[in-house]
């Protein structure tokens, strides 16, 4: 299985985010994201967490998925406001994904 490159994972997550954010985020968060994204926005691939089973109710192989966060960074370049966390399968033939939205 060819793993997603970081750029591919980021592009996929951002496309899904843009498509689904309106249905899953609070209007105030959407406004904040839109106003701040150019200056502070970030979409980053991070090390795949092993606690996704607690979030989605099923065990996953961290090596089979990419984890991507969409949010805003602070002045220390740390993402301190995460709007969505994505878990995206590396399997192009069965592109499975899960999203945890900001509450």
Curated annotation (Swiss-Prot):
NCBIfam families the UniProt entry points to: PRK05094.1
Organism: Actinobacillus pleuropneumoniae serotype 5b (strain L20)
Transmembrane segments: none
HAMAP family cross-referenced by the UniProt entry: Put_dsDNA_mimic
Protein family (similarity comment): Belongs to the putative dsDNA mimic protein family.
Taxonomy, superkingdom: Bacteria
Chain's role: May act as a double-stranded DNA (dsDNA) mimic. Probably regulates the activity of a dsDNA-binding protein.
SUPFAM superfamilies on file: Putative dsDNA mimic (SSF102816)
Name this protein carries in UniProt: Putative double-stranded DNA mimic protein APL_1348
């Amino acid at each position: 299985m060819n793993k997603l490159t970081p750029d591919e994972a980021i592009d996929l997550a951002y496309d899904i985010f843009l498509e689904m954010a309106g249905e899953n985020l609070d209007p105030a968060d959407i406004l904040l994201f839109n106003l701040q994204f150019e200056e502070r926005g970030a979409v980053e691939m991070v090390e795949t967490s092993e606690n996704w089973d607690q979030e989605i109710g099923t065990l996953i192989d961290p090596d089979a998925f990419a984890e991507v966060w969409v949010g805003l960074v602070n002045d220390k370049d740390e993402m301190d406001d995460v709007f969505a966390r994505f878990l995206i399968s590396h399997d192009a033939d069965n592109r499975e994904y899960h999203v945890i939205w900001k509450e």
